[in-house]
Amino acid sequence: MKIVVLAGGRSTERNVSLTSGHKITHALQTKGHDVAFVDLFLGNELKDGATIDSLYSSDPVEKDYDIDDEVLTDDDINKLREDGSTQLFGPNVLEICKTADIVFLALHGGDGENGKVQAVLDVFEIPYTGSDTLAAGITMSKKVSKEILLFNNIPTARFVAAYRHQPMPEMPFEYPVVVKPSNGGSSVGTHIVHNEAELKPAVEDALRFDNEALIEEFIKGREFSLGVINEQPLPAIEIEVNDGWYDFEHKFVTGNTTKFVTPPNNLPDDVHEAMKQMALDAMHALGLTNYARIDFFWSPETGLYVIEGNTLPGMTPLSLIPQEAEVLGISYPDLCEMIVNGKLALLNEK
């Protein structure tokens, strides 16, 4: 099968995406597929006589790509392109994608995950992994997705929204609170705020990455994540951070300070099963298909709360879904192929 792995792009999570993309490329090549790795934003100018066919390879040569702990801004990323243009799709990206049997979306955050890329691929009838345009856009907006979850009686933290050049909203809950960009991921621009003095700087920082920020009530409890592949829930994974909380650095850089436990210790079986069902309920409410990840808080006192859904979960060595799949004996290459085959099966049902 000819597969394009689309990664990078223009997002604060660009570096995470590149790491996921290189790992996915290598994994699918080990399964015998012809794979082309393409950076959404930089594209490929096909210089020196290169052709689109020459970009594909089934030779699994693994490329190490360390995640830079620096969060890139749009200006930083725009400087990577020689011609200075800022359009989302780089040179020849669409032409390359048109030659594939399916595009594996290894994009994270921003325009890579908010439905824009999916919409363009839909226009050209190019198959791709993950959820469709509408579900991607809904889930990328934490505000909209939380409203949908609440409408469907799926527990999630209460919140208010803050905007640039607008008065700070009144909060119907006490400190501490969580401040985050409404459209973002990997905990970029996210803060735990303990008092009024910390609130304004935290909101201002979150608004550097988006024009809308959420102020959420802080839910005290253990943090879990649960992936779903082709309607099958994986075992939950518990995230234990030795110092601080599960921010960008803990997620992708300093893995030694974060402990992942799957299946979780001392999690009642009935709670684990309820978490699996709630993950499916959240996916269905948000319209997610193929694969996704749902994050939770739980304690005996508060019960289960959905934090958010993730339409294109990370696939780096420290990412959660690969670790959950491994518990079931699913190797990383098999996991990637399951995602591809699952999406093709969905498309064939239409």
Curated annotation (Swiss-Prot):
Transmembrane segments: none annotated. One of its GO terms (biological process) is regulation of cell shape. The keyword Nucleotidyltransferase does not apply. It comes from the Bacteria. Its cofactor is Mg(2+); Mn(2+). Belongs to the D-alanine--D-alanine ligase family. This is D-alanine--D-alanine ligase. It comes from Latilactobacillus sakei subsp. sakei (strain 23K). The gene is ddl.
